[in-house]
Amino acid sequence: MIGKLSLLLVCVAVASGNPAAGKPWHWKSPKPLVDPRIHVNATPRIVGGVEATPHSWPHQAALFIDDMYFCGGSLISSEWVLTAAHCMDGAGFVEVVLGAHNIRQNEASQVSITSTDFFTHENWNSWLLTNDIALIKLPSPVSLNSNIKTVKLPSSDVAVGTTVTPTGWGRPLDSAGGISDVLRQVDVPIMTNDDCDAVYGIVGNGVVCIDSEGGKGTCNGDSGGPLNLNGMTYGITSFGSSAGCEVGYPDAFTRVYYYLDWIEQKTGVTP
């Protein structure tokens, strides 16, 4: 059971050639945070990893939600973006920015698309954080190019111990004033669900966790973004520890493989 669930709303200023251009908006991260049930001995860490090579993750989407919230997403077809339910729950509209690396700059590669057609999983539970998955339908197919590509869905599950790579514009440090200007990535191993559940108590079959004990992980602003491996997305950034991003507690992702039937039913997209 959850001792306490809090939504950390971190205000961050963004000014770029995408939806934030010329507007004094203050973006908030809706990433859910859960109180750990056990103590993890870990030293403070830089959570953001390293800056990604520009456009090396061309399926990565930046989501500007209701002029207020920021999340990530994955382009799984020319018309569909995969993200987290906690990002889209109660939203009115979303600006989907594709082809971006630096979200504070007006990059020629960026394409911005407004959508009001999206939905969360029918059994999304914001208290237990189950079924944390959502889909965004673009109003028309986006043109694919070297900077904007789709990512494949996995045809098999990811094994414990496998090194995977989450990506996003989330905060690189707990002390950071806002999200990262540039897309970042970090390599981390998959851990067992039993070990992850020992920390949070809410980890079911639809969740996959990464071991952050080595000093790496995701943070606020990474919500909804992909967990990458071999050209496929195995997870959707879901929740982390209320103790902070730098203390070494596991990070949890929605397990994409578990939801393949649901994704196919809604979009027709298959592995």
Curated annotation (Swiss-Prot):
Residues 46-268 form the Peptidase S1 domain. The active site is at H86, D132, S223. Residues 16-45 form a propeptide. InterPro entries: Peptidase_S1, Peptidase_S1_PA, Peptidase_S1_PA_chymotrypsin, Peptidase_S1A, Trypsin_dom, TRYPSIN_HIS, TRYPSIN_SER. Keywords: Collagen degradation, Disulfide bond, Hydrolase, Protease, Secreted, Serine protease, Signal, Zymogen. Residues 1-15 form the signal peptide. It comes from the Eukaryota. Its EC number is 3.4.21.1. It catalyses: Preferential cleavage: Tyr-|-Xaa, Trp-|-Xaa, Phe-|-Xaa, Leu-|-Xaa. It is found in: Secreted, Extracellular space. Disulfide bonds join C71-C87, C196-C209, C219-C245. GO terms for cellular component: extracellular region. Coiled coil: none annotated. It holds the Pfam family Trypsin. GO terms for molecular function: serine-type endopeptidase activity. GO terms for biological process: collagen catabolic process; proteolysis. PROSITE patterns: TRYPSIN_DOM, TRYPSIN_HIS, TRYPSIN_SER. Serine protease with chymotryptic and collagenolytic activities. Belongs to the peptidase S1 family. This is Chymotrypsin BII. It comes from Penaeus vannamei (Whiteleg shrimp).
